[in-house]
Amino acid sequence: MPDTIVAISTPIGTGAISVIRMSGSKSWQICQNVLLRKTKIEPRKAFHNYVKDSDGTILDEVMVIFYKSPNSYTGEDMIEIMCHGGIAVTQSILDTLISHGARPAEPGEFTRRAFLNGKIDLTKAEAVKQIIEASSRKTVKLVAANLAGRLSEIVHKLRETLLGTLAKIEVEFDYPDEILTDPYLIEKELNDAILQIEEILKNAQNRLILSSGIKVVIIGKPNVGKSTLLNTLVKEERAIVTDIPGTTRDLIEVPLMINGISFTLIDTAGIRHSHDEVEKIGVERAIKAADEGNLILFVLDATTPVDENDKKILSLIKEKKYIVVINKIDATDLIDREELKKILGTNTHVLTISALKKEGIQRLEEEIIKSVKDLIQQTDGYITTQRQYEYLASCRKELSDSIEAFKKKLPLDIVAQKVKEALGSIDKLLGTDYTDDLLDRIFKDFCVGK
């Protein structure tokens, strides 16, 4: 029988209330042992009481709710204790429950038990974590549909359809001398399944980018003001700023919110030819970050003419989406605009700013939003994790292989095997086929108490 687990479910800190959650077969027994008054309980009804410690001293006035198995979040007997939201009082109640036999919960253990007890599948479990971590309204909307079970519902229906198709194929295989099903119908059902998967996957990469934060990479040669720009955009000192070129050697990643859209802003080492081994590593990382970014802010220094280092950087990013940012316009402007236009071409966005004086920053933010509009707009759908994407893409490939085998009139057991492999990918997506390692990876980053 699983241990009875306990954890604080609300953020640690001072607030109006804290919630302590306990799940397992001994939940009510342990709870009774710490309550001042013996109470007759009704499931899902809050009641008033006091929590006492082992010597009978009252710790706090509380409200308690009991959830009877299987009608609870975890599918087990569950208790929620709502106490005053102080750090000391909440921890004291938690310690008292542990001293009476409850075990401190691991990260995500309540949701893991909900999955293992059949209350949710893995798509819903992932949605729980994502809605807690969502940093923008757009991401909340994307994830909420899966929390309500939309992706799960669609994929379960797809699974049922494929099971029916597999049954038709296996009947043909078992009775080869009889024509029991129109071959065209089998092929059509497989094609329809592929079309359905493609509809689910449509714009999925954009949704994954949006949910994790659109990557905006700041690049340029040393001492052009990249770190100052990062600090100005995030409105705090996150990167070290000095007049010494090459101060930034490693990537600095900072979350940024603009108009409710979540970004990850990345400051990089200045790109130039160098014999310094550490600086060379920083330059390599900067180039790699630019290659992986969704948008580049290419920073030029208004106080120095465009040189070969600038041109080299431009050659590295010319296939990417980028904005040219001329910084330090509060000082002497030595950049020849006509020469710059020849180098960049006429369609390149060029903005002038002073990161130090915070001039032109609002216009830059507006241009950033405009530049990623395609990512922001094309986000309808339900795929919100790379794991979901990969299993559905695998399912699509296996179904395509089954159609090819069918068209080539290969033995029907080969066609059936491909459909079974497609179903296997769906089972892994939903979690009906899982390993402990997979669950560990999914739940390890959950907060304790969820």
UniProtKB/Swiss-Prot annotation:
Q: Please state the Enzyme Commission number of this protein.
A: 3.6.-.-
Keyword list, A-Z:
Cytoplasm, GTP-binding, Hydrolase, Magnesium, Metal-binding, Nucleotide-binding, Potassium, tRNA processing
- Family matches, as InterPro entries: G_TrmE, GTP-bd, GTP-bd_TrmE_N, GTPase_MnmE, MnmE_dom2, MnmE_helical, P-loop_NTPase, Small_GTP-bd
Which top EC class is given? hydrolase
Per UniProt, (6S)-5-formyl-5,6,7,8-tetrahydrofolate binds at: 21, 80, 119, 450
Chief location category: cytoplasm
Give the residues the record marks as binding Mg(2+). Answer: 227, 248
Q: Which domain of life is it from?
A: Bacteria
Cofactor(s) named in the record: K(+)
Q: Which residues form the TrmE-type G domain?
A: 213-373
Q: Which BP terms in the Gene Ontology apply to this protein? A: tRNA methylation; tRNA wobble uridine modification
How many cofactors are bound and how? Answer: Binds 1 potassium ion per subunit.
What GO MF terms are annotated?
Answer: GTP binding; GTPase activity; metal ion binding
Question: Per the record, what is one GO cellular component?
Answer: cytosol
In this chain, GTP is annotated as bound at: 223-228, 242-248, 267-270
Where can this protein be found? Cytoplasm
- Per UniProt, K(+) binds at 223, 242, 244, 247
Q: Which HAMAP family match?
A: GTPase_MnmE
Task: Give the similarity note.
Answer: Belongs to the TRAFAC class TrmE-Era-EngA-EngB-Septin-like GTPase superfamily. TrmE GTPase family.
Q: PANTHER family per the record?
A: TRNA MODIFICATION GTPASE GTPBP3 (PTHR42714), TRNA MODIFICATION GTPASE GTPBP3, MITOCHONDRIAL (PTHR42714:SF2)
The subunit field of the Swiss-Prot or TrEMBL record says:
Homodimer. Heterotetramer of two MnmE and two MnmG subunits.
Q: What is this protein identified as? A: tRNA modification GTPase MnmE
